Swiss-Prot record:
A GO term, aspect molecular function: ATP binding
Annotated residues for binding of ADP: G157, V158, S159, R160, C161, G162, K163, T164
Keywords from the UniProt entry: Kinase, Nucleotide-binding, Serine/threonine-protein kinase, Transferase
Function: Bifunctional serine/threonine kinase and phosphorylase involved in the regulation of the phosphoenolpyruvate synthase (PEPS) by catalyzing its phosphorylation/dephosphorylation.
Recorded catalytic activity of this chain's protein: [pyruvate, water dikinase] + ADP = [pyruvate, water dikinase]-phosphate + AMP + H(+); [pyruvate, water dikinase]-phosphate + phosphate + H(+) = [pyruvate, water dikinase] + diphosphate
Full protein name: Phosphoenolpyruvate synthase regulatory protein
Family annotation (Pfam families): Kinase-PPPase
Keyword Nucleus assigned: no
InterPro entries: Kinase-pyrophosphorylase (IPR005177), PSRP (IPR026530)
NCBIfam families associated with the record: PRK05339.1 (NF003742)
E.C. numbers: 2.7.11.33, 2.7.4.28
Length: 277
């Protein structure tokens, strides 16, 4: 067995496997182990299920350690094949459905692809999500200042502090129309809030970052440049943070947070409603 890997983990579903991945990853993060993840979506027929079973069994025979299998599968005949494998199998949805069934006195009606599939009941939500993504792409990095009033939040910050990935995550995960505006080196001699943003101050949210981390990120993009120098990064961060304080713009330091955590903090601080897709 590879000494760098403590356990092999399978995420298996008859749909996208997103649910299995998210819940399985949340569970595995509780343990101090290194894992090798294998995600297998759209296991919808017996032939594919047998191939998945063989893959699980092969790893068991190769390593001598049972793979961990997190699965979400509707059809019982497909589930039965997976359960015949040498893996330690956990039905992540059924573990929650069974007690809820008792509490609500209702029988579940499982349907494949219900969680992330399209149907007449969620088309409007899906269209709104795509519109949010289109808007966010069109308003990335100050590309366009038109229709800024349609943004639900406008992120500010120096170059490479995490504005773009956070904006896209907000749009894709929560359907939030997000614009972002960069403060560049040329702005620093007289840094003020642009006139186009002043009427929208209630929508502004600032990101900052530790100068040392910013310099390391920029160094990968433009090696040995003034843009990436620690001195330049310190100056830009100090100026932008002063701007936030002066204009009472809420802000967070993104250095030690993941994109998911940054986005969630923005939603919470700005009072934006989370939308589930």
């Amino acid at each position: 067995m590879d000494n760098a890997v403590d356990r092999h983990v399978f995420y298996i579903s008859d749909g996208t496997a997103i649910t299995a991945e998210v819940l399985g990853h949340a569970v595995m993060s509780q343990f101090p182990v290194t894992i090798s993840s294998i995600t297998l979506p759209f296991v919808e027929n017996e032939s594919r299920a047998r191939a998945v079973k063989d893959q699980i069994d092969a790893i068991y025979h190769q390593t001598g350690v049972r793979p961990l299998v997190f699965y979400s599968i509707v059809l019982p005949e497909i589930r039965a094949i997976i359960l015949q494998s040498e893996g330690f199998c956990q039905d992540i949805v059924q573990a929650l459905v069974a007690p809820l069934q008792q509490e609500m006195k209702l029988d579940p009606t499982p349907i494949a692809h219900r969680t992330h599939g399209l149907n007449p009941n969620n088309l409007n939500k899906y269209d709104a999500r795509i519109a949010a993504i289109d808007y966010t792409l069109a308003h990335d990095d100050g590309i366009s200042l038109r229709n800024l009033d349609q943004a639900q939040v406008i992120l500010l910050g120096v170059s490479r502090c995490g504005k773009t990935p956070t904006s896209l995550y907000l749009a894709m995960q929560f359907g939030i129309r997000t614009a972002n505006y960069p403060f560049i080196a040329d702005d620093m001699d007289n840094l003020v809030l642009p006139a186009s943003l002043k009427p929208l101050q209630h929508k502004l949210f600032g990101l900052t970052i530790d100068p040392e981390r910013l310099a390391a990120i920029r160094e990968e993009r433009r090696e040995n440049s003034r843009y990436a120098s620690l001195r330049q990064c310190r100056m830009e961060v100090a100026e932008v943070e002063a701007l936030y304080r002066k204009n009472q713009i809420p802000w967070i330091n993104s250095t030690n947070y993941s994109v998911e955590e940054i986005a969630t903090k923005i939603l919470d601080i700005m009072g934006l409603s989370r939308r589930m897709y």
